[in-house]
């Protein structure tokens, strides 16, 4: 039976980075994955260019029942550390918006970089490998694989969450946590589009593909100011994906379709300058024409000129466009979700090492635990930071 210092399960962002860093620190590491290729989710991310971190990473951008848990790891391995590594590999990158960093070329460059770092650390990578059983004794961990049995002093679970099952997502990590007595918090899809109830969806069907700047507020007061996209299933776009992580079934979200415009003042100015101009054409100066036409067809925008618009109508119009209350039917679920909310309870883990407090040698990193970042590179940075913290702990075990 082949023995390793550590076995890492999951060749995604966190798993590859942890294996590489532990290997380079002198540990003998086996990296396992059930897929044909490593880094499948990395390749799909950022429209194929991988939004690998964010310039503005801070703990406040992460959701967890323990909001303090992520602080240590994020402080010890920062976005600047990963940017430095990307630079050493000659990967050109650019900032797209809101601090989001993307490869100029392809997400494959990040995967290749991680594979190279694994090779540098002498990591043994085995793909298309199923972990059938995990057992623990005084000597560490024994894993029954499809075709062989291996053992190790330490076991690192980097198997991710439930989002994007088409890329191999599974509840494997949660099952291992429960097997060893760790609490797993309820999971749900995060960073995911909303679906709408049929009556509202039918009213908005002509808007599919229309994108508009917005400010969306959840019932807990959280606000995101980014674009909203109308789809044939409901609402999407960065603002919707962001707010979905703060939304609970049955709740409303409030949408401001004109976050950069004081609509009341704008209408008053236009009325003074162009009293005979139609209200529809005036609003089309600030909103997509298709959106204005749809709202007028629904009776939300009076078919009048500016001088005919009375104060009550103007007040109602401002309310409609800047305080639109929407109750989503649900979300599109794990199929299209970028992340999984919930997971292994961080109160069960050390924030410095990612090791289970009551199970020596068992570690959890990345998305499998209850730490979820905002859209825009934050979840990749958590993968790098939690993996680095774990790798340092593995190195100290020598």
What is the role of each PLM region?
Residues 23-47:
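Glycine-rich FAD pyrophosphate-binding loop
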Residues 49-95:
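Glycine-rich active-site loop/strand segments that organize a redox cofactor
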Residues 76-154:
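Feature captures the FAD/FMN-dependent oxidoreductase FAD-binding
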Residues 7-9, 32, 131, 150-166, ...:
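Short hydrophobic core segments
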């Amino acid at each position: 039976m082949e023995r390793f210092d550590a076995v890492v399960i999951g060749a995604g962002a966190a798993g590859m980075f942890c294996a590489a860093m532990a290997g380079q620190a002198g540990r003998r590491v086996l990296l396992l994955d059930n897929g044909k290729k490593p880094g499948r989710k990395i390749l799909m991310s950022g429209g194929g260019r991988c939004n690998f971190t964010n310039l503005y990473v801070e703990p406040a951008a992460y959701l967890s029942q323990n909001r303090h848990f992520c602080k240590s790891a994020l402080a010890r391995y920062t976005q600047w550390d990963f940017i430095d590594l990307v630079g050493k590999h000659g990967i050109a990158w650019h900032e797209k918006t809101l601090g989001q960093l993307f490869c100029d070329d392809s997400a494959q460059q990040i995967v290749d970089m991680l594979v190279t770092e694994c090779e540098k650390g002498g990591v043994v990578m085995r793909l298309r490998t199923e972990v059938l059983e995990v057992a623990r004794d005084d000597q560490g961990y024994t894993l029954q694989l499809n075709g062989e049995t291996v053992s190790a002093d330490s076991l690192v679970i980097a198997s991710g969450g439930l989002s994007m099952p088409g890329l191999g997502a599974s509840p494997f990590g949660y099952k291992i946590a429960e097997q060893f007595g760790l609490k797993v918090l309820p999971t749900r899809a995060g960073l995911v589009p909303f679906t709408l109830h049929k009556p509202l969806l039918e009213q908005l069907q002509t808007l599919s593909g229309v994108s508009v700047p917005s400010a969306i507020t959840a019932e807990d007061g959280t606000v995101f100011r980014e674009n909203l996209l109308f789809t044939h299933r409901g609402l999407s776009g960065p603002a919707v994906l962001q707010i979905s992580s703060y939304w609970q079934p049955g709740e409303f979200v409030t949408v401001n379709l004109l976050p950069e415009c004081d609509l009341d003042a704008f209408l008053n100015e236009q009325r003074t300058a162009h009293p005979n101009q139609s209200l529809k054409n005036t609003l089309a100066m600030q909103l997509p024409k298709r959106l204005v036409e749809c709202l007028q067809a629904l009776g939300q925008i009076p078919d009048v000129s500016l001088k005919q618009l009375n104060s009550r109508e103007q007040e109602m119009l401002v309310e409609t466009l800047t305080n639109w209350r929407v109750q989503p039917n649900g979300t599109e679920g794990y199929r299209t979700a970028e992340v999984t909310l919930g997971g292994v309870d961080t109160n069960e883990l050390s924030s410095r090492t990612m090791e289970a407090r009551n199970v020596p040698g068992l570690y959890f990193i990345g998305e499998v635990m209850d730490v979820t970042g905002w859209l825009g590179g934050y979840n990749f940075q958590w993968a790098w930071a939690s993996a680095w913290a774990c790798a340092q702990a593995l190195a100290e075990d020598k």
